[in-house]
């Protein structure tokens, strides 16, 4: 429908971890794609950055790409197409991050790439099925590489929010999942085990989440105070929002 109306389709590479090596976004009808290298291709992200997100497109859009494009095989040259939108940046992003992603792809190989995706999907479904008798699943069906829990019912019953459960995970040595996303799910926790976790670590995470649910029902205040074992305890988010420090204060 979009193509018939003269539009183009854009693929968010954040979900590629579930399908890489199995399907081709171009064959699915997409014209442009960005790749989240930190999510699918094992590169650093955020505080461990820098992040990087290469953009790919179909051949019909190549004449319009920003300049300069590297062309050639034996000898490389910079090319600027007549219809190019011109220069956007004076550099080509975080090159070393792209090299690391390429190394990861070549290490996995043709068989390893789809296997990684299949393991990611398997791990997510395993965890979801181990938790759905306690936690409410936003979408109670077979998932891809991640699943979303809604803690809205738990909050109404006990006063414990998704934030409280996330903080409780820290006290148990587990990094919290993505909180409050997607925005359309109330009290959301989006869990993405990834392909690298073993059954043992998945079972450990499930055990902790089930324990936190029990604590929410029996001793909610314990989770309201969490984390208590980390070097930095719970931040005053309201105070930070109302009285932000936006620049460093130099000492006289």
What are these regions (language model features)?
Residues 23, 73, 77, 84-88, ...:
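Non-catalytic terminal extensions of PLP-dependent enzymes
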Residues 11, 16, 41, 99, ...:
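Residue-level detector of functional hotspots within protein domains
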Residues 50-54, 58-96, 100-107:
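Long, C-terminal catalytic modules of enzymes
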Residues 11-14, 90, 94, 116, ...:
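Glycine- and other small-residue-rich loops at beta-strand/loop junctions that grip anionic moieties
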Residues 1-75, 159-160, 187:
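Conserved PLP-enzyme active-site core in the AAT-like
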């Amino acid at each position: 429908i979009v193509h018939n109306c003269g539009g183009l389709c854009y693929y968010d590479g954040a979900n590629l971890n579930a399908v890489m090596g199995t399907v081709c976004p171009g064959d699915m009808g997409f014209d442009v794609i960005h790749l989240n290298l930190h999510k699918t291709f094992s590169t650093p992200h955020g505080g461990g950055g820098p992040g990087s997100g290469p953009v790919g497109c179909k051949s019909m859009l190549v004449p319009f790409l920003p300049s300069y494009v590297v062309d050639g095989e034996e000898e490389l040259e910079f090319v600027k197409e007549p219809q190019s939108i011109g220069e956007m940046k004076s550099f080509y992003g975080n090159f070393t991050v792209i090299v690391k992603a390429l190394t990861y792809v070549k290490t996995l190989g043709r068989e390893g790439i789809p296997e990684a995706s299949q393991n990611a999907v398997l791990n997510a479904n395993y965890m979801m099925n181990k938790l759905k008798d306690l936690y409410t699943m936003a979408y109670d069906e077979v998932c891809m590489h991640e699943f979303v829990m809604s803690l809205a019912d738990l909050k109404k019953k006990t006063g414990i929010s998704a934030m409280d459960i996330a903080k409780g995970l820290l006290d148990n040595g587990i990094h919290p999942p993505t909180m409050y996303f997607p925005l359309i799910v109330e009290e959301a926790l989006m869990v993405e085990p990834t392909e690298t976790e073993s059954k043992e670590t998945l079972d450990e995470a499930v055990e902790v989440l089930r324990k936190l649910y029990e604590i929410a029902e029996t001793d909610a205040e314990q989770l309201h105070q969490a984390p208590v074992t980390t070097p930095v305890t719970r931040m005053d988010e309201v105070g930070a929002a109302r009285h932000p420090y936006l620049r460093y204060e130099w000492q006289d």
